[in-house]
């Protein structure tokens, strides 16, 4: 199976030139209860994920869906017929791509897109996986929740040409091999996640794990003390 990765611009203040997963910070609007009318899930089977995420679970899930569309152009949502949005037609693809820049510039919200397009966000298809916290002592620290989802078959994704300048579907094994050859820049946390993903033989086993996971890794690595 392949995963979608983005190359950050060399002008970025953080992880410049590195290949990363789609993602970003949680915005205040991501916590709004107004989204409850425009989402499906979390399902009963996802109750352990809700518990692991804590009282801010809504914001984390909405942020994951918003950033996936904003950065990668992948919209994980159901249309008015209850089918996953496909963007198979050029007209639909172009219309949705035109939402991305105003969304990035905070001139448009994901909630407004859902209202305009009559969408319900597919929270039930996006699964909390694990959490990584940057070690104390680093100049920039992050507390990151990682999610796993299967992209709709008809959607291919594309970088935003602002924060990211390249995009690629690639197997975890190939990404790790290219990284070893100094041809595919990765942060340590991304490399570790790829090593975990590479253990799964196919997409179905990976998604099955994500759907049924009951214990969630929280990794807080420590830096060696200064000499």
Give the label of every model feature segment:
Residues 1-227:
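N-terminal leader/linker segments that precede catalytic domains of diphosphate-processing enzymes
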């Amino acid at each position: 199976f392949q995963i979608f990765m983005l190359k950050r611009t060399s002008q970025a203040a953080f992880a410049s030139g590195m290949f990363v997963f789609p993602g970003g910070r949680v915005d205040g609007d991501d916590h709004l209860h107004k989204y409850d009318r425009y989402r499906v899930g979390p399902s009963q089977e996802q109750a352990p994920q809700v518990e692991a995420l804590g009282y801010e679970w809504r914001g984390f899930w909405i942020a994951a869906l918003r950033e996936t569309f904003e950065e990668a152009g992948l919209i994980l949502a159901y249309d008015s017929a209850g089918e996953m949005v496909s963007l198979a037609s050029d007209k639909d693809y172009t219309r949705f791509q035109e939402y991305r820049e105003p969304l990035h510039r905070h001139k448009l919200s994901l909630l407004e897109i859902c209202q305009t397009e009559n969408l319900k966000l597919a929270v039930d298809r996006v699964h909390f996986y694990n959490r990584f916290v940057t070690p104390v002592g680093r100049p920039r620290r992050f507390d990151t929740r990682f999610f796993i989802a299967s992209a709709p078959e008809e959607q291919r994704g594309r970088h935003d040409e602002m924060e990211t300048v390249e995009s690629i579907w690639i197997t975890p094994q190939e990404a790790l091999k290219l990284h070893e050859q100094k041809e595919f820049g990765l942060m340590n946390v991304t490399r570790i996640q790829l090593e975990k993903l590479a253990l799964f033989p196919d997409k179905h086993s990976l998604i099955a794990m994500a759907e049924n996971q009951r214990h969630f890794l929280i990794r807080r690595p420590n830096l060696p003390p200064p000499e």
